[in-house]
Amino acid sequence: MHLKGNYKLLIENLLELSHLAYVHANTLGTGAVAEEQMKFERGERDVTLTRWIMDSPVYNMFQKLGGFEPNEHVDRWQHVTWTPPAFVKLDVGAARANTGAIDGDRSQGFGYRNLNAITPETDKTSHYFWAQARDFRTDEDWISDMFVQATHEAFSEDMWIIALQQKNMDTGTTNPRIDINHDGAALQAIRMLDVMIEAQNATADEAQAAE
């Protein structure tokens, strides 16, 4: 997918999943996502975000994937890991509420993995590659088709929002930028990335000066 925005904006988007409740209200989100607090941890070369949405209503796509009833509640998880320069891995899923998913028992639900690989093209455009994998109901092709369609639709919504965000930033009237608690993981990732870029540029400058 081609993104009309800086690659860092997409990294921030993937590390701040409370936007699911607003940008993806008809595809991936419920209001409960934005209401729950997330935890994040910064490692030496990664940032990991974890959010549990406990005892929450199940939205349409998860109903189909997990075989849940429309009025059932589920415990949802979102585990997101960023590794430099621009790889974001997601482990997401849901299980029937209060059946032990938070303690590691996912037998009453399902989960899937998502890989996002982002390649800068220019300061204001990027290439977005993604892949999805699952280990449940693997013989049902309609699930693969639904995954592709739903994911592409959701990511297209992201592309639209980020393009508008880039356009707004290009006006030069968006400073100062306001960050909120949900931005914590994204801020840590971008800070780590900026330090790495600065170090790489310094090394290149030193090498050039030595020639």
Residue ranges and their predicted role:
Residues 1-211:
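C-terminal catalytic domain of Rieske-type non-heme iron oxygenases
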